[in-house]
Amino acid sequence: MEVLATDTVSQQERLQAIAEKRRKQAEIESKRRQLEDDRRQLQYLKSKALRERWLLEGTPSSASEGDEDMRKQMQEDEQKARSLEESITRLEKEIDVLEFGESAPAAPKENSAAPSPIRPHSTSPAKEEQKSETMVNAQQTPLGTPKENRKSTPVRSPGGSTMMKAAMYSVEITVEKDKVTGETRVLSSTTLLPRDPLPQGVKVYEDETKVVHAVDGLSENGIQPLSSSEVDELIHKADEVTLSEAGSTTGPAEPRGLAEDVTRTTPSRREITGVEAQPGEATSGPPGIQPGQEPPVTMVFMGYQNVEDEAETKKVLGLQDTIKAELVVIEDSVTPREPAPLNGSAAELPATKEENQTGPTTTPSDTQDLDMKKPRCRCCSVM
């Protein structure tokens, strides 16, 4: 029965402490809102007084009723400003008292080594329990002593109980510090599962989400605790190293064979006026099948260019300084034709005799047909 009564009393005290804390939070919020309103009103009064003073300085020395009213208003505004300044100072002190309690101000540096005075007994049992627990934890884990690795991080709930939050993963980071510049360089980063055995070391940083231990690397001056910014920078560098390693292993440079295959699949035939494309030159096979051909060339498309001038077109296509030649193909016939003489009368008689002796010969129409059957002339450019 006594144990149950004690538990009930402690539970009631905790509820009272929580209610008191909420009441203080609400009071602090209301005082802060009032403080902001007073500051805005004080700023308005100061700017108004400055404007009125500037107007009074520009008026002539002869006083008038309007000037007297303005001076009276300035005096009233100054009194309001003084009262607002006092109210602001009082609210700031009250907020400090509500946030930090009725603790004494910080002692000077020369008295910092003196033992702390006995605290008043006005604090609630819940606060006393929390303070004593904090002191015990501080005595159990002094700075610089090794501590066993834990796979979970303790998180204190609002009710005051300690709840263990399981760790999702661990990261082992190997760093190297330059003694001259003091720069820290990350050598490697390895992700460990929570079930893997964690190496033992000295805890240098801890918060609600992560714990950092220093392993194998004791410096001459001992291990210094890390700040949150240093931990974030270290994690960022480790992520960069991990990404660079992943890129070097999974994303190698494209081999030449792949580039050649891509080049072979793309059409390489290009029609240019004056150049005849041969059938064997349209595509190039693999180097192993046709050793006589040259290896393919990778071409990069740089864009289109609209050219209207013929000279500019030749310049763009590389045909500016070329020589044009005409190729004429002559086929052999049954009776080669002799060139006609300058005077056709002398050769007409033998021709008629030969026609009477040998029979009919080729007519001009047949000659025309023979000329039409000849291949057409082709124009080529000699580069």
Swiss-Prot record:
GO biological process, one term: positive regulation of dendritic spine development
Key words, A-Z: Acetylation, Cell membrane, Cell projection, Cell shape, Coiled coil, Lipoprotein, Membrane, Methylation, Palmitate, Phosphoprotein, Prenylation, Synapse
Feature: compositional bias, Basic and acidic residues: 69-96, 257-273
S-farnesyl cysteine lipid modification positions: 380
Phosphoserine carried by residues: 116, 122, 124, 157, 161, 244, 345, 365
Gene Ontology terms for molecular function: D3 dopamine receptor binding
InterPro entries from the UniProt entry: Paralemmin
Segments for region (Disordered): 51-164, 242-293, 333-374
Biased composition (Polar residues): 133-143, 357-367
Coiled coil: 7-101
Keyword rRNA-binding: no
Residue list for modification Phosphothreonine: 141, 145, 153, 242, 361-363, 367
Tissues expressing the protein: Expressed in neurons cells of neuropil-rich areas of the brain, in the Purkinje cells of the cerebellum, in cells of the cerebral cortex, hippocampus, brainstem nuclei and glial processes and sheaths. Expressed in the medulla of the adrenal chromaffin cells and renal duct cells (at protein level).
Cellular component, GO, one term: neuron spine
Membrane topology: Lipid-anchor
Function comment: Involved in plasma membrane dynamics and cell process formation. Necessary for axonal and dendritic filopodia induction, for dendritic spine maturation and synapse formation in a palmitoylation-dependent manner.
Subunit structure: Interacts with dopamine receptor DRD3.
Family that this chain belongs to: Belongs to the paralemmin family.
Protein name, as recorded: Paralemmin-1
This protein's encoding gene: Palm
